[in-house]
Amino acid sequence: MSAPGSSCTEPGPPLWLLAELTYRCPLQCPYCSNPLDFARHGAELSTAEWIEVFRQARELGAAQLGFSGGEPLVRQDLSELIGAARGLGYYTNLITSGIGLSEARIAEFATAGLDHIQVSFQAADAELNDLLAGSGKAFARKLAMARAVKAQGYPMVLNFVTHRHNIDAIERIIELCLELEADYIELATCQFYGWAELNRAGLLPTRAQLERAERITNQWREKLAAQGHPCKLIFVTPDYYEERPKACMGGWASLFLDIAPDGTALPCHNARMLPVQFPNVREHSLRHIWYDSFGFNRFRGDDWLPEPCRSCDEKGRDFGGCRCQAFLLTGDAEATDPVCAKSAHHGLILDARRQAEEAPLGLERLVHRNARTSEIICRSRSE
């Protein structure tokens, strides 16, 4: 089934499955991609329910399984879930803050069959890291766990979400990652969804900051290549400084399948913000969800595209851009992504750039992600 969204051919399998095991998290990062109203979402899937999700997704062709959150380490059944995924033949990776990790759990995960670990940091110094995380001593714990991950022999990605308050320390960030023997360094400039969108005025870097950071990253790439160093640097820019939108997730429901903690199935991490009814694995099979559900077919292909996207010769590359970003900025999920210079709403992006230059919010005004604030947001929306 391809309707209602498009005339596209039958979609391929969901190759990448992301299991958002929980929205619970010990940290309070102001750029978290979790929904603002996470406090209102229902009970988490049980161990047995998650394993059934893994089984069904594997039958559909999923090959890679990421364990995410929130903080997936708060799930006491994580080792069991890893073992079940390994038994089904997945390549598995754990995406974690490192808080709640221990040498014993790292060894336990290795025994269960975990393939890969990504550890996130907030900054390259303890004071800023812990301020952004909303947790004292988080930095010291992260350092210890990154070293323990390497000692266990895992391939390790160190991830830094960069923004206006830490991006100027990009060189120190890279140096720290090399000291910790990272195999990959992901320098991911903040993407503005969830809590990051709420705090955009305090997080969006200036163009000059981004250009400097990218220049330094490229210099380090050249230096490491000349040394024959195996570490790879990945630099992700925000599309707020582009004139064409990103091809979000490689196209709506084309290869990525996200399962939220309560079992809601989504074509991307942020799609539950949209005015679209998405199915739940407690009520439908993954085969039905992926191939036949309204939500997953809503923006597949290109029949749904408005002008100027419909007649644009670039629509096969960007698919009209990000539906979540279009909705966040315009209130219309079908609108052309305002990042695109051809969009009638591109002025919203230009305004955001100007604000980053002229009137950014200070670090002290960032709203931290936590259950109490989420509950306040939920109440305000219901009034």
Curated annotation (Swiss-Prot):
Gene Ontology molecular-function annotations: 4 iron, 4 sulfur cluster binding; cyclase activity; iron ion binding; oxidoreductase activity; S-adenosyl-L-methionine binding
Catalyses which reaction(s): [PQQ precursor protein] + S-adenosyl-L-methionine = E-Y cross-linked-[PQQ precursor protein] + 5'-deoxyadenosine + L-methionine + H(+)
Free-text comment on the cofactor: Binds 1 [4Fe-4S] cluster. The cluster is coordinated with 3 cysteines and an exchangeable S-adenosyl-L-methionine.
Listed GO biological process terms: pyrroloquinoline quinone biosynthetic process
Domain Radical SAM core: 11-226
UniProt xrefs under InterPro entries: 4Fe4S-binding_SPASM_dom (IPR023885), Aldolase_TIM (IPR013785), Elp3/MiaA/NifB-like_rSAM (IPR006638), MoaA_NifB_PqqE_Fe-S-bd_CS (IPR000385), PQQ_synth_PqqE_bac (IPR011843), PqqE-like (IPR017200), Radical_SAM_PqqE_MftC-like (IPR050377), rSAM (IPR007197)
This protein's UniProt keywords: 4Fe-4S, Iron, Iron-sulfur, Metal-binding, Oxidoreductase, PQQ biosynthesis, S-adenosyl-L-methionine
Pathway the protein takes part in: Cofactor biosynthesis; pyrroloquinoline quinone biosynthesis
Keyword match S-adenosyl-L-methionine: yes
Residues bound to [4Fe-4S] cluster: C25, C29, C32
Cofactor: [4Fe-4S] cluster
EC numbers, comma separated: 1.21.98.4
Protein function: Catalyzes the cross-linking of a glutamate residue and a tyrosine residue in the PqqA protein as part of the biosynthesis of pyrroloquinoline quinone (PQQ).
Known partners and oligomeric status: Interacts with PqqD. The interaction is necessary for activity of PqqE.
Family of the protein in this entry: Belongs to the radical SAM superfamily. PqqE family.
Protein name: PqqA peptide cyclase
Organism of origin: Azotobacter vinelandii (strain DJ / ATCC BAA-1303)
